[in-house]
Design a protein with these regions (language model features):
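Glycine- and acidic-residue-biased ligand/ion/polar-headgroup-sensing regions
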Residues: 54, 63-78
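Short, well-ordered beta-strand segments in beta-rich or mixed alpha/beta enzyme
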Residues: 47-52, 71-74, 88-90, 99, ...
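Ligand-binding loop in jelly-roll beta-barrel domains
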Residues: 93-122
Length: 152
């Protein structure tokens, strides 16, 4: 039966995003790595998995948009509280964070709707946004391709 209206996507390149479990992690430091799951260019939102080894300290930062975090395993010291496996936190736009510390090896899902600015006592040090995450994903894909071709 035909549909009463045309509901085909206006943009024909719209498609699902699938990231396999074996997708590569990107090392950001010896104590921290990230796996980029999705980048939404049209909204500036991105989704990523982060794995921090016990003792890793993330620098002070400010959220320029809301963000969601869900702890899959481990334990994080965030401001004056502790997030455990199974805990969810929403961080609104404008929130300032002091250092965040991994109290155990920790993996968490992070969905951010905009940029995050990092700073120290001397001021702004760097930022992360969808463009940075897109570059990281492209870098990981490029590194994974030779391994996949070698396996064939």
């Amino acid at each position: 039966m035909p549909l009463p209206q045309d509901i085909r996507p206006v943009f024909q390149d719209i498609q699902d995003t699938l990231v396999r479990a074996e997708a590569p992690w990107i090392e950001q430091s010896p104590m921290a790595k990230v796996k980029v799951l999705w980048v939404g260019r049209e909204t500036g939102t991105w989704a990523s998995l982060h794995h921090w080894k016990k003792g890793y300290v993330a620098p002070r930062h400010k959220h320029l948009a809301g963000a969601h975090a869900y702890v899959l395993s481990g334990k994080l010291q965030v401001r004056d509280g502790v997030l455990n496996a199974g805990d969810y936190v929403y961080e609104p736009s404008g929130v300032l964070h002091d250092e965040t510390t991994a109290l155990e090896d920790t993996t968490y899902l992070f969905i951010c709707n905009g940029a995050v600015l990092f700073f120290d006592e001397n001021g702004f040090t760097r930022y992360t946004n969808w463009e940075v995450m897109e570059k990281l994903r492209a870098q990981a894909d490029a590194q994974a391709t030779p391994r996949a071709e070698a396996a064939e």
